[in-house]
Amino acid sequence: MFRILIFLSLILKPSIGLSQGYDVFGIGIYDVKSDGSSSENATDVRYERRFDITLIDIGPEQDNFFYLKPFAGIELTSDSAFYLISGIYLEDNIGDLFSGKDNNWNFTPSFGVGYYDDGNGKKLGNKIEFRTTIEFSYQLINKDRIGISFGHISNANIGNKNPGAEIISLSYQKPF
């Protein structure tokens, strides 16, 4: 619990000098399975802070899709598991991505690594876990967003076992 409080105090402190980013609040289903295999479903609650700071620009100058930006967050499940995560994300307007004209839809893939404690939930095989997520969101007039995401948590075979877990979530995103 002490680790969680320290982590939250670091990501929730005021962000001096940051132009804009998003606080992301999500709720979903942890360990979603569609292949008929056994599942240990739980409710997944997530908070992320996405910073609008470019860490690395890996693409052509005219395309802002390749700006890697940082995020940090926490996920909690109804079976007492928690995951402290930090990583990078890309973000682009879907209209701009395909037609060159902005619209209200955004595409946000992300990759992170963090500390996982399984609580009474699914045993993922290691304390260090990686998460990849694909998200689509709709930007409202006030710049808030509503999104849906699909993610996968795995230890990338660095543990003795690697069952992984899929998560589908709905999110509300508020600019800060």
Predicted regions and their residues:
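Repeated loop/turn-to-beta-strand initiation elements of outer-membrane beta-barrel proteins
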Residues: D23, I53-G59, G95-F98, W105, ...
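N-terminal signal peptide c-region/cleavage motif recognized by signal peptidases
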Residues: P14-I16
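Outer-membrane beta-barrel initiation region
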Residues: L18-D57
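Transmembrane beta-strand segments that form the barrel wall of outer-membrane beta-barrel proteins
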Residues: D23-K33, F65-T77, T108-D117, I148-S154
